[in-house]
């Protein structure tokens, strides 16, 4: 399921590079996109009550799916993909967030309240990207809320995002910070992006 999202992103990047130079190959790629979408990203946790087919007990997995769906819309201009990402986020990602003295963050699973970087970093990025596409202060507030949770509970002073540091959690949080900077023009976000990416390098 989530591995499908990462593999599909590679195909999308290739599509973006060749779509104007090789229409035949671009058409083949677009067919792959449709097959992946129609097959619900090979969602092995799909239940009969899930009308979208993309819902999953693992919150981080749904965040990865949303990022790929958003990327598909950015690459093809087809709104069906980002509209599904919006649906998944609105109904089954942000609704899982819970609050304690450390702040409000996303749990790893529907039945596991632990809140980690591999869930909250891509979740923050999804919220920021949905805000840039649809507007809606709720998405911006969600992105800021998850950013605040990560900085307050997971980010180390040297730029590590939780232990052990993983390139995908470092990268998604760094990109979420960059997106928030471009939305708000507040330098705090760019400074955090620089800290996180410099540590990763």
Regions found by a protein language model. Give the residues of each.
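Glycan-recognition and catalytic cores of secretory/periplasmic carbohydrate-active enzymes
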Residues: 1-201
């Amino acid at each position: 399921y989530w591995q499908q999202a990462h593999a599909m992103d590679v195909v999308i990047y290739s599509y973006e590079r060749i779509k104007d130079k090789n229409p035949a190959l671009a058409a083949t790629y677009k067919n792959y996109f449709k097959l992946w979408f129609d097959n619900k990203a090979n969602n092995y946790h799909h239940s009969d009550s899930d009308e979208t087919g993309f819902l999953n007990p693992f919150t981080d997995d749904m965040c990865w799916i949303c990022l790929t769906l958003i990327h598909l819309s950015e690459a093809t201009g087809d709104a069906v993909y980002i509209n599904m990402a919006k649906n998944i986020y609105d109904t089954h990602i942000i609704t899982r967030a819970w609050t304690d003295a450390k702040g409000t963050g996303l749990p790893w699973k529907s039945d596991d309240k632990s809140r980690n970087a591999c869930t909250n970093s891509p979740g923050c990025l999804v919220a920021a990207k949905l805000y840039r596409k649809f507007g809606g202060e709720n998405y911006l507030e969600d992105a800021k809320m998850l950013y605040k949770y990560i900085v307050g509970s997971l980010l180390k002073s040297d730029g590590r995002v939780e232990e052990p540091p993983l390139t995908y959690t470092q990268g998604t949080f760094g990109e979420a910070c960059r997106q928030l900077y471009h939305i708000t023009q507040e330098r705090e976000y760019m400074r955090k992006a620089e800290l996180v990416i410099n540590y990763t390098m």
